[in-house]
């Protein structure tokens, strides 16, 4: 039932300031299948409590951040946040905000921004999926005209919610789609035809949007999948996404995508950063944006070793689905607790509303700290 969020927030933060450190989250999980290919865990409330958050490892923040704000600053910011829906949601949001505000790794000390850098001057708002599948995201769920009309509406909502930060629209296309079957080459992924990429790129251009090409590599590798995208990534308005959930390496060998959550190491991400940075230099492009999805800590290993390069702006995107409390907990544990550079937040039109919760509004997402600079709708 609805509660007065501001009053509860103040009480919870005072209690948190005097209480014990947060406990590590429990490990119990139950599977969810979001398509014939992808699956992911969705803990129950008892398995990961709202206070069940990991503190940021020293290595994650060392040398990257500044002194955390005093509790008084946290209280001031929390008192201005919107009302939420349930006590559980409010507890989790307060805990998530506190995690971000108290982590000395935020804000990350990034290299000096180059001309044309998109972040943090703009916030990217993206529709995600593949036009060949109605189950993988909004990009393929509706006919193009309807999808783009809804896209315009969502972008307008974000512009209204935060007028101080311009919105950069984006279409986020999965171009290597993980599969449960091996395929002819045994790599358990299907590559999109270049013609499909051009089609989505054309849709994006018609809306003044950028295009993000996403890799679900399966048993293939980033250094096998990325080179074929170079002709597209050489364009100034095309960027890259990596999905560790379907990267079956780093002790996932022998497992089929969607039967076990995959993982990437910082080395995999750094390879992509190097390739994108080289394109920026070679073709005199504005800096690229690299989106890396994450909803468990193990999905992205050695995150503190991801390099910072002014030619590539890295976003760690929270892409867990579920009720608001679960999404806030996941954001705290996987994004706010381990600073890399920028953060993102994913919203699911269907999976987030399965239990009757309305999808989180822009204003609710903007309550998080650090504020996500990339917003993705599936």
Give the label of every model feature segment.
Residues 131-133, 175-177, 217-219, 244-248, ...:
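Active-site-proximal loop/turn and secondary-structure-junction residues that shape catalytic pockets
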Residues 15-17:
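C-terminal motif of bacterial Sec signal peptides marking the signal peptidase cleavage site
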Residues 217-222, 281-299:
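Aromatic-lined carbohydrate-recognition surfaces of secreted/lumenal glycan-active proteins
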Residues 249-263, 317-319:
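Extended amphipathic alpha-helical segments with heptad-repeat/coiled-coil character used for oligomerization
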Residues 164-209, 219-235, 239-244, 248-249, ...:
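Chitinase-like catalytic core of GlcNAc-active glycosidases
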Residues 166-167, 205-210, 236-239, 284-289, ...:
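Loop/turn elements at helix/coil->beta-strand transitions in domains of secreted/extracellular proteins
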Residues 2-10:
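Sec-dependent signal peptide recognition
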Residues 19-191, 304, 308-314, 325-378:
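Alpha/beta catalytic barrel-like cores
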């Amino acid at each position: 039932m609805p509660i007065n969020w501001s009053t509860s927030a103040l009480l919870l933060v005072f209690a948190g300031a005097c209480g014990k450190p947060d406990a590590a989250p429990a490990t119990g999980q139950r599977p969810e299948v979001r398509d014939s290919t992808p699956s992911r865990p969705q803990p129950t409330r008892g398995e990961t409590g709202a206070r069940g958050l990991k503190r940021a490892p020293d290595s994650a923040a060392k040398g990257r951040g500044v002194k955390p704000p005093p509790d008084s600053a946290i209280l001031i910011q929390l008192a201005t946040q919107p009302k939420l829906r349930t006590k559980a949601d409010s507890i989790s949001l307060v805990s998530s905000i506190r995690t971000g505000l108290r982590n000395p790794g935020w804000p990350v000390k990034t290299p000096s921004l180059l001309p044309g850098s998109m972040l943090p001057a703009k916030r990217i708002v993206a529709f995600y999926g593949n036009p060949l599948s109605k189950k993988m995201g909004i990009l393929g769920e509706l006919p193009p005209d309807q999808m783009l009309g809804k896209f315009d509406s969502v972008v307008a909502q974000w512009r209204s919610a935060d007028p101080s930060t311009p919105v950069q629209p984006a279409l986020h296309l999965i171009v290597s789609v993980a599969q449960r079957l091996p395929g002819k080459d045994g790599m358990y992924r299907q590559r999109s035809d270049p013609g499909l990429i051009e089609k989505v790129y054309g849709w994006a251009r018609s809306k003044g949007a950028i295009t993000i090409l996403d890799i679900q590599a399966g048993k293939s590798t980033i250094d096998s999948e990325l080179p074929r995208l170079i002709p597209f990534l050489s364009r100034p308005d095309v960027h890259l996404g990596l999905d560790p959930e379907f990267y079956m390496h780093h002790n996932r060998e022998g497992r089929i995508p969607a039967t076990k959550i995959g993982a990437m190491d910082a080395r995999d991400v750094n390879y992509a950063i190097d390739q994108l940075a080289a394109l920026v230099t070679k073709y005199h492009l504005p800096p690229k944006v690299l989106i890396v999805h994450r909803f468990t800590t193990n999905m992205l290993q050695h995150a503190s070793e991801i390099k910072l390069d002014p030619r590539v702006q890295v976003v760690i995107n929270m892409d867990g689905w579920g009720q608001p409390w679960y999404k806030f907990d996941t954001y705290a544990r996987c994004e706010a607790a381990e600073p890399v550079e920028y953060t993102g937040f994913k919203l699911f039109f269907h999976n987030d509303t399965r239990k009757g919760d309305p999808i989180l509004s822009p204003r609710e997402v903007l309550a998080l700290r650090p504020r996500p600079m990339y917003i993705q709708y599936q």
